[in-house]
Amino acid sequence: MTSTSDADPFVEGDDFGDREFRRGVWRQTLTNVALVTVSAGGRQNVMACEWAMMVSHAPLCFTIAVHQRNATHDMLLEAGEFGLNFCSDEQAHLSHVSGSNSLHDVDKWQLADFPTYPATRIEAPMIEGSVLNVECRTVGTHRLGHTLFIAEAVWARYDPTKSPLVFHGGKYFHVGEQVPKPQVL
């Protein structure tokens, strides 16, 4: 990890084994925040998931990245389905509670008032008040440092009056002002 010059603010390198360098790279990314809900083996869980995104329009597919040591990981494998609830900017507290605690230690549903409603096509409850709720069926997995769960949407609902919660540099944000698109010549 080196800076290209004293006057240059860039940090560059290929030492991805260096935790601080990886953290610096990660903190330059911008993501939304989703709450993953799952029911399996007679239990339910909710997990904050920063790495959640749409990956296909037709068919409508999403992916989430979940570390293998998370309790949610094995539940997702067993269930083969999950709820993907993209947080509104009013739900940072729900993200914080579900992202700061593990089902290995505590029942997160008891730590906060997670407003839920019954799903239409899956077993897991859905989180009320989200900007987008997607009921998903897993169609594949790919193991990296985390496991990518690739899923097809089987039901969705969204609220166009709400604004998404944004995560950057370890902090929550509201969506800001629109940057005008430049004119194409």
Residue ranges and their predicted role:
Residues 2-185:
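Basic, polyanion-binding surface patches
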